[in-house]
Amino acid sequence: MILGIGTDLANIERIQGVLDRFGDRFRNRVFTDVEQAKSERRLDVAGTYAKRWAAKEACSKALGTGLRMGIAWKDMSVSNLSTGQPVMHVTGWAKARLDELTPPGHEAVIHVTLTDDHPWAQAVVMIEARPILPDVQTAQTT
Protein backbone atom coordinates (compact mmCIF):
# COMPACT_ATOMS: atom_id res chain seq x y z
CA MET A 1 0.00 0.00 0.00
CA ILE A 2 1.19 3.52 -0.71
CA LEU A 3 1.66 5.65 2.41
CA GLY A 4 2.76 8.84 0.68
CA ILE A 5 4.00 10.44 -2.52
CA GLY A 6 6.02 13.63 -2.78
CA THR A 7 7.66 15.53 -5.60
CA ASP A 8 9.81 18.63 -5.85
CA LEU A 9 11.45 20.72 -8.52
CA ALA A 10 14.63 22.68 -7.73
CA ASN A 11 16.35 25.32 -9.84
CA ILE A 12 20.02 24.35 -10.24
CA GLU A 13 21.07 27.98 -10.83
CA ARG A 14 19.38 29.00 -7.57
CA ILE A 15 21.22 26.26 -5.70
CA GLN A 16 24.49 27.40 -7.34
CA GLY A 17 23.79 30.93 -6.08
CA VAL A 18 23.19 29.68 -2.55
CA LEU A 19 26.40 27.62 -2.70
CA ASP A 20 28.34 30.68 -3.91
CA ARG A 21 26.86 32.92 -1.23
CA PHE A 22 26.80 30.63 1.81
CA GLY A 23 29.23 27.81 0.94
CA ASP A 24 29.94 25.42 3.81
CA ARG A 25 27.30 27.02 6.02
CA PHE A 26 24.62 25.89 3.54
CA ARG A 27 26.26 22.52 2.80
CA ASN A 28 26.67 21.61 6.47
CA ARG A 29 23.14 22.69 7.42
CA VAL A 30 21.36 20.74 4.69
CA PHE A 31 23.55 17.86 3.49
CA THR A 32 25.21 14.93 5.25
CA ASP A 33 28.93 14.22 4.87
CA VAL A 34 28.13 11.40 2.43
CA GLU A 35 25.97 13.69 0.28
CA GLN A 36 28.62 16.39 0.29
CA ALA A 37 31.37 13.96 -0.70
CA LYS A 38 29.26 12.63 -3.59
CA SER A 39 28.26 16.10 -4.78
CA GLU A 40 31.76 17.56 -4.62
CA ARG A 41 33.16 14.70 -6.75
CA ARG A 42 30.69 15.34 -9.56
CA LEU A 43 31.28 17.50 -12.63
CA ASP A 44 27.93 19.24 -12.04
CA VAL A 45 28.28 20.01 -8.32
CA ALA A 46 25.26 22.32 -8.12
CA GLY A 47 23.09 19.90 -10.10
CA THR A 48 23.96 17.06 -7.75
CA TYR A 49 23.15 19.18 -4.70
CA ALA A 50 19.91 20.37 -6.35
CA LYS A 51 18.74 16.79 -6.93
CA ARG A 52 19.41 15.94 -3.29
CA TRP A 53 17.64 19.13 -2.15
CA ALA A 54 14.62 18.15 -4.25
CA ALA A 55 14.72 14.60 -2.85
CA LYS A 56 14.63 15.88 0.74
CA GLU A 57 11.71 18.19 -0.07
CA ALA A 58 9.87 15.36 -1.84
CA CYS A 59 10.51 12.97 1.05
CA SER A 60 9.19 15.45 3.60
CA LYS A 61 6.03 15.82 1.48
CA ALA A 62 5.65 12.04 1.20
CA LEU A 63 5.89 11.88 5.00
CA GLY A 64 2.94 14.28 5.07
CA THR A 65 4.70 16.97 7.07
CA GLY A 66 6.91 19.05 4.83
CA LEU A 67 9.86 20.39 6.80
CA ARG A 68 7.84 20.81 10.01
CA MET A 69 7.16 18.83 13.15
CA GLY A 70 10.84 18.64 14.04
CA ILE A 71 11.98 17.08 10.77
CA ALA A 72 15.36 18.49 9.80
CA TRP A 73 17.21 18.52 6.47
CA LYS A 74 19.80 16.02 7.68
CA ASP A 75 17.09 13.61 8.88
CA MET A 76 16.83 12.65 5.19
CA SER A 77 19.85 11.58 3.17
CA VAL A 78 20.39 10.30 -0.37
CA SER A 79 23.10 7.83 -1.28
CA ASN A 80 23.53 5.63 -4.34
CA LEU A 81 23.82 1.89 -4.84
CA SER A 82 26.74 0.63 -6.93
CA THR A 83 24.32 0.59 -9.88
CA GLY A 84 23.73 4.33 -9.45
CA GLN A 85 20.19 3.90 -8.11
CA PRO A 86 19.43 6.56 -5.49
CA VAL A 87 18.41 5.40 -2.01
CA MET A 88 16.73 7.54 0.66
CA HIS A 89 17.72 7.07 4.31
CA VAL A 90 15.76 8.60 7.19
CA THR A 91 16.82 9.18 10.79
CA GLY A 92 15.65 11.26 13.73
CA TRP A 93 12.20 12.83 13.48
CA ALA A 94 11.79 11.71 9.86
CA LYS A 95 12.30 8.08 10.94
CA ALA A 96 9.87 8.58 13.84
CA ARG A 97 7.26 9.95 11.42
CA LEU A 98 7.86 7.05 9.02
CA ASP A 99 7.38 4.56 11.87
CA GLU A 100 4.17 6.37 12.87
CA LEU A 101 2.80 6.05 9.31
CA THR A 102 3.72 2.38 8.91
CA PRO A 103 0.90 0.00 9.88
CA PRO A 104 1.60 -2.97 12.16
CA GLY A 105 2.77 -6.03 10.24
CA HIS A 106 4.33 -3.90 7.50
CA GLU A 107 7.75 -2.50 6.69
CA ALA A 108 8.26 0.87 5.04
CA VAL A 109 10.12 1.01 1.74
CA ILE A 110 11.12 4.41 0.34
CA HIS A 111 11.44 4.67 -3.43
CA VAL A 112 13.20 7.71 -4.90
CA THR A 113 13.98 8.82 -8.42
CA LEU A 114 16.06 11.84 -9.44
CA THR A 115 16.44 13.62 -12.76
CA ASP A 116 17.71 16.89 -14.10
CA ASP A 117 17.51 18.94 -17.27
CA HIS A 118 19.34 22.21 -16.73
CA PRO A 119 18.25 24.43 -15.07
CA TRP A 120 15.88 22.04 -13.30
CA ALA A 121 16.39 19.12 -10.93
CA GLN A 122 13.45 16.96 -9.93
CA ALA A 123 12.79 14.22 -7.40
CA VAL A 124 9.85 11.94 -6.76
CA VAL A 125 9.56 9.94 -3.54
CA MET A 126 7.03 7.20 -2.87
CA ILE A 127 6.70 5.50 0.49
CA GLU A 128 5.31 1.99 0.37
CA ALA A 129 4.08 -0.16 3.26
CA ARG A 130 5.04 -3.72 2.36
CA PRO A 131 3.54 -6.62 4.37
CA ILE A 132 6.07 -8.54 6.43
CA LEU A 133 5.67 -12.14 5.37
CA PRO A 134 6.04 -14.85 7.98
CA ASP A 135 9.31 -16.74 7.79
CA VAL A 136 8.44 -19.73 5.58
CA GLN A 137 11.11 -21.95 7.14
CA THR A 138 9.84 -21.22 10.67
CA ALA A 139 6.26 -21.93 9.61
CA GLN A 140 7.26 -25.31 8.15
CA THR A 141 8.97 -26.48 11.35
CA THR A 142 6.09 -25.66 13.72
Curated annotation (Swiss-Prot):
Keywords in alphabetical order: Cytoplasm, Fatty acid biosynthesis, Fatty acid metabolism, Lipid biosynthesis, Lipid metabolism, Magnesium, Metal-binding, Transferase
GO molecular function, one term: holo-[acyl-carrier-protein] synthase activity
Disulfide bonds: none
GO terms (BP aspect): fatty acid biosynthetic process
Name recorded for this polypeptide: Holo-[acyl-carrier-protein] synthase
CC terms in the record's Gene Ontology section: cytoplasm
Described function: Transfers the 4'-phosphopantetheine moiety from coenzyme A to a Ser of acyl-carrier-protein.
Organism the protein comes from: Ruegeria sp. (strain TM1040)
Family membership: Belongs to the P-Pant transferase superfamily. AcpS family.
Record: residues binding Mg(2+): 8, 57
Keyword Metal-binding: yes
